[in-house]
């Protein structure tokens, strides 16, 4: 992570544009030292997390803990692969928690339940979630004295 507490990115790639001589899977199996919230928007993609494969649908949300191996697996005619990824440090995740909700517990559940990595956001809530995530991205890209304060709120 470039920033010590969190980063957020909206990524859009044309997977069909990769040259056939390149490896079939342009993103290799990997892990991070931080938590990852992955919001899937589009593409023909399965997602591998710790030996469990999830077939993704628009509006799916994946939670991955530090050091969990994960990788998108692109299927035939994957097309545009669009997602928003939020990387967040464990300390920051704890700071965002309160007596009513522990964000860390959401990730700890993924380690004990093989289905817990994946959450499907209802269609009527998807636009709202994507709006707030894109607003956070916009705030982070605005370089002024208030952007860090707004992003942390």
Stretch-by-stretch model annotation:
Residues 42, 66, 88-90:
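Residues immediately flanking
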Residues 124, 140-153:
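All-alpha amphipathic helical-bundle segments outside canonical DNA-binding/catalytic cores
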Residues 1-61, 68, 100-117:
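Generic protein-terminus/edge-of-domain signal
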Residues 49, 73, 144-145:
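A generic structural signal for short coil/turn motifs at secondary-structure boundaries
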Residues 66-72:
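Short acidic (Asp/Glu) patches
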Residues 57-58, 73, 150:
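Short amphipathic alpha-helical leader/targeting segments
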Residues 2-18, 73-141:
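A hydrophobic/aromatic-rich effector-binding and dimerization subdomain
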Residues 31-34, 123-126, 152:
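Short, solvent-exposed loop/helix junctions and linker helices
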